[in-house]
Amino acid sequence: MRKMLSFSALATLGIAHAAYAATSKYGLQDPESPIAREIYSLHNLILWICIAIFVLVFGTMFFAIIKHRKSVGHKAAHFHENTTVEVVWTIVPFVILMGMAYPATKTIISMKDTSNPDLTIKATGYQWKWGYEYIKGEGSLAGVSDGISLYSSLATPMEQIYDKNVPKSENYLLEVDTEMVVPIKKKVRILTTANDVIHAFWVPAFGVKQDAIPGFIRDTWFTVENPGVYRGQIGRAHV
C-alpha cells in the first residue's frame, strides 16, 4: 500500500453497484479527463446543430403555412421537379453529416486507444460489488497481478434504501466502503470482466462506460486531470 500512497496526487474512484443512482441534470457532468472533454464538446456541437435544424425546418414550415395559406388568396404552385432545390437539399445534409461524423469518429478512435498505459487495473463485476486488481504499473508487484487487490461494496445504509421515511444522503447509492485509487495525469487502462451477469463500469466524469461480460475481457481507459473523489455506478438496470 505504501507504493500507492507515494503518488504526488491521487484521485479516488468509487463505483457503486446500483443503477440510475446519479442525480438527474439537464447536461453532462463536468469533464475531468481528455476523453470526457471530447465527448462533452461533441455533445454540445451536435446539440446545437440539431437545434439549428429544428428551428430552420419548423420555422420554414410554419412560415409557409401562415403566409401562404389559401384564406389570404395564395394558390399552390404546380411543378414536378426543381433541380436546384434537389441539389441543395442533397449537398447541405451531406455537409452537415460529415461535420458531425469527423469529430465523432475521431473521438471513438481515441476512446478505443488503450495502448501504452501507465497503469492497468482489472475490474471484475460481482453481485453486488466490484473487485479490483492492480496488474501493471504503480500498485503492482513486478508488473504481475499479485499486487494490490481489493473489493468495493455499496456503503449506503440499508435503511435509506428500504425505509421511505429515512432521508437520503447526498451521495445516495453512490458511496462505497473501499475506493479505487489512481494517479492523476497518468493513462489508466481498465480491463473489465464479470463473475456472474453483465455489469457496466461507468464513470460519467471520465467519459467511461464499458460493459463487463462474464468470460470476456474488454478494456477502456481514462486520464484523471485533477485530484478528487469521483463517483461512478453500474450502468445496468438489473439491480
Language model segments and positions:
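N-terminal secretory/membrane targeting signals
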Residues: 1-22
